[in-house]
Amino acid sequence: MEDRYLYTTAVPILLGGGRLAGKTAQYLYGHYGLEVRWLGDTWHPLLAIYAKRLASLPLTEENDATVTRHLLALAEGYRRSVGIPAIIPCSPEAEAYLTRAEDTLEEEFVLLPLPDLTQSPLRGLLRREDTP
């Protein structure tokens, strides 16, 4: 069962790029009408339609500090809003980055797993709400 309110207050931030990011952005816009943000360097046509690009940065260890700065600056804007900023990795590189930066980001964002699109990419929000 979905909690539509929880899903529609999410602020999805896609990390990575390519086809999975494009399909995830399309899913989130189509199912929930969500404005999706995207940070990555691999373009896909669906991203141009369904996502607002934050920055074009490769997700390499050398860029970790820059990517983290971009994300934390974005989090500043959501501190006083009702939105729930949620990072969704869309590539193996994005998953690896989140593993490296988890301690820094987990206070500001909900960190979700790589989506498979057979279920909502935001399903992890429900599990997060159940934890103390």
Regions found by a protein language model. Give the residues of each.
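ATP-binding N-terminal substructure of ATP-dependent carboxylate-amine bond-forming enzymes
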Residues: 1-122
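Active-site nucleotide/adenylate-binding loops and adjacent lid/helix of ATP-dependent enzymes
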Residues: 121-132
